[in-house]
Structure formats: C-alpha cells, structure tokens
From Swiss-Prot:
Zn(2+) binds at residues 15, 18, 37, 40. It comes from Paramagnetospirillum magneticum (strain ATCC 700264 / AMB-1). One of its GO terms (molecular function) is ATP-dependent protein folding chaperone. ATP binds at residues 119-126. This is ATP-dependent Clp protease ATP-binding subunit ClpX. Component of the ClpX-ClpP complex. Forms a hexameric ring that, in the presence of ATP, binds to fourteen ClpP subunits assembled into a disk-like structure with a central cavity, resembling the structure of eukaryotic proteasomes. HAMAP family: ClpX. CDD domains: RecA-like_ClpX. Gene3D superfamilies: 1.10.8.60, ClpX chaperone, C4-type zinc finger domain, P-loop containing nucleotide triphosphate hydrolases. ATP-dependent specificity component of the Clp protease. It directs the protease to specific substrates. Can perform chaperone functions in the absence of ClpP. The lineage of its organism: Bacteria, Pseudomonadati, Pseudomonadota, Alphaproteobacteria, Rhodospirillales. Belongs to the ClpX chaperone family. Residues 3-56 form the ClpX-type ZB domain.
C-alpha cells in the first residue's frame, strides 16, 4: 500500500518497500503506482556497490583493471585523482606480475613498491586500506617511528611481517601476497648529512633494516613475536611478492623542491608564481628522487620505492565532500548512530562548510573532522538517550561556531504542524 485511507492521514504517502511514511523520510520518489524513499535508494546503491566490489575481488582469472580499482577507490576516498591513478596502475601491475610470474622466465619483472607523499590527513592510510579491501589480501600497518635496528630497544623490522602473518591467520602463502603500509617514513630520515660517531638506530639504521624485506628476502618470523621467546620455532616468509606502500607528510620537502628551481619562467605558458603562492600539494607533485635524498632518505631506500604518488591538500569543498559523500562518510555514521535512538540528524550546508573550515584552520586535514564532530555533538549525544519523542536534531552554522544549541524537533510538534496545515 502506498496511501493510507483511514482518518486524517488518508493523503499520507508511504514507501512501497520499507513502509515508512513521507514524514519519516527526507524524500519520497513517485513511480507508476509505487513510491520509494531516499533510504531505500541508498540501500539499493550499497547492494549494487558491494556486488560490484565482490565481482572485482573474485575475478581471479583476470586481475582487476586499473579503472576498476580506481572506481572502487572513488567510493571511499574523495579527490586525489592523480594518486588514485598511480596507485591503481601500480597495484594492477604488481598482482598481474604475481599471476603470470612463472609463465615467461626470460624477462623477470621487478617489484614496484610505492611511496605516498602528502600533507597530514589527506588520505594516504585510507588509500592503502581500501586497496587491500578491494583485492581481498592480508593487510597490516606499521609506524616507522617505533622501529629500531635489531639489537636495540624498540620494535624489530621483522615484527612487520609477523603482523602481516597474523592478519593472514598464519597462512604463509596468503601473507606472501599481502600489502604492508609503513606510515611516517619521513620520520626515519637521516638526522644529519655528516657521519657521526653515535649510531643512528632509529633513522638511517631503520632504513637499512627495511631494505632487505622490501626488496625480497626470506624472513625468519617468530610466531609469538620478538625477543621474549628465543627458543621458539621460526616461520619462513618470503617477502618477494609482498607489496610495500610507504607514506609520510615530508614536512619541509616543498622547500627543498622550491630551492631546486622549477626551470625557466619565461614564455607564455610559464608559471611565474612564487613558492609561497602555490599550495603544498602542487609543489610536491614536482618531487624528484634527488629531493628525497636531500631530505634524508638513503639512496638504496629511495631505489626500493620506484613509484611516487603525491597527494593534494584538501580544500573546503573536498572536506565537505568527505563529510557527506563517501559510503562510510562521517555524517552518515553519526546519522546511523542517532537512528539507533529513533532520531534523525540533519546538517545544514553552512554547518558542513563551517566544520570544513575548522579542520583547515587546525591544519589536521580529514583526520580532524571526527574530533570536531564529536565536540559539536557531545552534549546532544549525552542528553538524547534520556529525552522522549525527539524526532530530529538539526545542526547549523551557529551550532558549529558555538553560538547556539542544536535545534530539537519533537514528534508531537511536527504532528501539530502537519494537522494545522
């Protein structure tokens, strides 16, 4: 039934799929003798996306094409089209190399590990996590700042492979096709250009330790982890086919690129803007291996990362899209949370813009959006479970800026307005 024929509500329209009335949903779309609400449309889109993603994952006869990979990345990551293209091609080639590795021994295809360079909160980690989800391979993430050379206090490089093995549920064969993301690699840069009598165990020493596992070696991994169980039996894991993705903000790299010079500034097509007039992401796109060497990475480490992908700064429009558009967008997450209290949550356009502007002012990128949302909604989430009949909570610009309280719309009031109309 799409219409109610009883009493005052005889003209009320209902969704033909979930049965909700036009007052319970944001939009009701009419068709020939049927209606569908916006929530059912979103649910249908989610089902179609999941089926498409499953088709990509299960198509083992042919590795997903770069376009297919990029299309799924678009569902989760806003913007960064250049980085997505670079990653999609590199990952496609990597797994195609694994699939056809034994069919032609005349030409040996080398592994192409990836280096992601971009400001904080621009999506480096999310890109790596989404890639692993698309390909249905084990994935682990390591923080380079916690690593030290073997024999020193800190985490051994081999522990990265142990985490990957744990993600693969100790299936060595699956782990050997996994993806490792090493974050904060810019923090293990060489501390000084001049050799020192004190050993740099958390900088250049870690780079040296990572070389072998990134290039390909058989690592001996203790199943219980680390140095606490020296008598245990070791597992042998070949890292040749593990894809390593390294990421870092590389603060100050843009100054090194700027000091290198950008070639000629003469001619009609020349960009005559100074470094201060250009955005950081725009400058980082011109990075060369020599710039990374000046930053403090050793030549051998740079050589193990032949694929460079740079990410752009996120502007206000991009952050607004991140808040509302992806499949697991923050706004959708909080709306789902409020639905559990039988309450709808709505953000005005100027509220989303104000949240994005706050994140830019804090220089935290997309990573800072959740913290801002938590602060805005804290009092509401504290009070709401104890309130009755709150139908909707509305957040506007004044609420984000702390100049007003969220607007509570009660079910009785909405019904009174509807009956008087």
């Amino acid at each position: 039934m799409t219409k109610s024929t009883s009493g005052d509500s005889k003209n009320t329209l209902y969704c033909s799929f979930c049965g909700k009335s036009q007052h319970e949903v944001r939009k009701l779309i009419a068709g020939p003798t049927v209606f569908i609400c916006d929530e059912c449309v979103e649910l249908c889109m989610d089902i179609i996306r999941e089926e498409h993603k499953t088709h990509l994952v299960r198509s083992r006869d042919g590795v997903p094409t770069p376009k297919d990979i990029c299309q799924v990345l678009d569902d989760y990551v806003i913007g960064q089209s250049h980085a997505k293209k670079v990653l999609s091609v590199a990952v496609h080639n990597h797994y195609k190399r694994l699939q056809h590795g034994g069919k032609n021994n005349e030409v040996e295809l080398a592994k192409s590990n990836i280096l992601l360079i971009g400001p904080t909160g621009c999506g480096k980690t999310l890109l790596a996590q989404t890639l692993a989800r698309i390909l249905d391979v084990p994935f682990t993430m390591a923080d380079a700042t916690t690593l030290t050379e073997a024999g020193y206090v800190g985490e051994d490089v081999e522990n990265i492979i142990l985490k990957l093995l744990q993600a693969a549920e100790y299936n060595v064969e699956r782990a050997q096709r996994g993806i490792v993301y090493i974050d904060e690699v810019d923090k293990i840069s060489r501390k000084s250009d001049n050799p020192s009598i004190t050993r740099d165990v958390s900088g250049e020493g870690v780079q040296q330790a990572l070389l072998k596992i990134m290039e390909g070696t058989v690592a001996s991994v203790p199943p219980q982890g680390g140095r606490k169980h020296p008598q245990q039996e070791f597992l042998q894991v070949d890292t040749t086919n593990i894809l390593f993705i390294c990421g870092g903000a590389f603060a100050g790299l843009e100054k090194i690129i700027g000091s290198r010079g950008r070639g000629t500034s003469i001619g009609f097509g020349a960009d005559v803007r100074g470094p201060d007039e250009r955005r950081t992401g725009e400058i980082l796109r011109e990075v060369e291996p020599e710039d990374l060497l000046k930053f403090g990475l050793i030549p051998e480490f740079v050589g193990r990362l032949p694929v460079l992908a740079t990410l752009e700064d996120l502007d206000v429009d991009a952050l607004i899209d991140i808040l509302s558009k992806p499949k697991n967008a923050l706004v959708k997450q909080y709306q789902r949370l409020f639905e559990m209290e039988d309450t709808r949550l709505a953000f005005s356009d100027d509220a989303l813009k104000a949240i994005a502007e706050k994140a830019i002012a804090r220089k935290t990128g997309a990573r800072g959006l959740r913290s801002i949302m938590e602060t805005i909604l804290l009092d509401t989430m504290f009070d709401l479970p104890g309130l009755d009949a709150v139908d909707e909570v509305v957040i506007n610009k004044e609420v984000v800026e702390g100049r007003a309280k969220p607007l509570y719309i009660y079910a009785e009031r909405r019904e009174d307005v509807g009956s008087s109309a």
